[in-house]
């Protein structure tokens, strides 16, 4: 069972980012809506709180654009430095910092985190950003 301090520490960064950005995050993608396909934190829609970082990802795409998205309130998000994230990675035979460019690996990581009750994952690095596993939990802002 988590201590009160662990709960505060794990929840606070995501909560802070969510409130600071008023639930609005950015995505650099191709004009057809495709991202880079790296999948470091699992499979889903990747976002960042940095519009300049999103622009860098857009610049690497064919006819890249930056889109804004509103993220649904109340999602349970895994910090990539948390014990739960480490547990999910350990279940896949990896250390928390060891990741793969494999889509299959990203799919397995997503499954592990979903089994632990998470809707997505995040890093404190704007290049790694945030992944929301289910697109129903984000809405594009036109």
Model feature map: region roles:
Residues 1-11:
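Short acidic, low-complexity intrinsically disordered linear motifs used
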Residues 11-142:
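Active-site and NAD+-binding cores of ADP-ribose-processing enzymes
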């Amino acid at each position: 069972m988590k201590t009160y301090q662990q709960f505060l520490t794990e929840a606070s960064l995501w909560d802070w980012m969510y409130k600071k950005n008023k639930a609005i995050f950015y995505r650099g993608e191709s004009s057809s809506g495709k991202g880079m396909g790296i999948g470091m934190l699992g499979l889903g829609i990747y976002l960042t709180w940095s519009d300049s970082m999103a622009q860098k990802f857009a610049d690497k795409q064919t006819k890249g654009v930056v889109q804004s998205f509103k993220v649904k309130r109340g999602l349970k998000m895994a910090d990539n430095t948390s014990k739960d994230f480490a547990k999910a990675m350990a279940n896949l035979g990896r250390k928390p910092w060891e990741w793969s460019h494999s889509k299959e690996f990203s799919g397995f990581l997503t499954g592990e985190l979903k089994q632990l009750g998470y809707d997505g994952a995040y890093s404190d690095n704007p290049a790694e950003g945030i992944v929301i596993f289910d697109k129903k939990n984000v809405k594009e802002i036109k």
